[in-house]
UniProtKB/Swiss-Prot annotation:
InterPro entries: Ribosome_maturation_RimP, RimP_C, RimP_C_sf, RimP_N, RimP_N_sf. The keyword Transmembrane helix does not apply. Disulfide bonds: none annotated. Keywords: Cytoplasm, Ribosome biogenesis. Residues 167-199 are annotated as: Disordered. One of its GO terms (biological process) is ribosomal small subunit assembly. Its main location: cytoplasm. The lineage of its organism: Bacteria, Pseudomonadati, Pseudomonadota, Gammaproteobacteria, Lysobacterales. Required for maturation of 30S ribosomal subunits. This is Ribosome maturation factor RimP. The gene is rimP. Belongs to the RimP family. Residues 177-189 have a biased composition (Polar residues).
Amino acid sequence: MSDKGIEIVNLLAPKVETLGFELLGAEYLLVPSGAILRLYIDTPFAMQPECMVSIDDCERVSREVSAYLDVEEPISGNYTLEVSSPGLDRRLFTLEQFARHYNQFVKVGLKLPQHGSRRLQGKIVRVEQVDGFVVLLVNGVELAVDFNNIDKARIVPDWSALGLAPLEKSKPDTKKTSQGNKKPSNESAARQAVRGVIR
């Protein structure tokens, strides 16, 4: 996450927790009309997979967080708030989240090249939280990746195991979203990808 994203997560995580959800992370994106603040929420880890986030949950959190941001004002200028479930190909924002998804495949984008590349894909085999490293098994070789050098990381779902493998190649990835009309104002919008519903 960016420094701004971390600042916003630290501010909003307690508020989201009072609503019964965990704030996994945030994206803060500058756009011509102002900015987009995208929050990823999930049910508490102990309640998964029995409980999952619904579109109604996203909308409720969006309303509450929007009102809270109007008071705290951590963002200057116009912005759009989006609240989303993580989906099957969820982003990973913290070392703890990497540890939760031990033995799963991830694709990682790096700020600076490591092991000769800025992009890696492999299985999470170990998380060294004290030293701040994620160890991935890539092509049969264990590679230690500095967590502070990770720009973005995302789970690579086993679609075949989930019974969701596409029947045809090159099909566009379609999403359903629940999102209000975007305006250049501090207006909230709740959205949820179809992939976040099927878990």
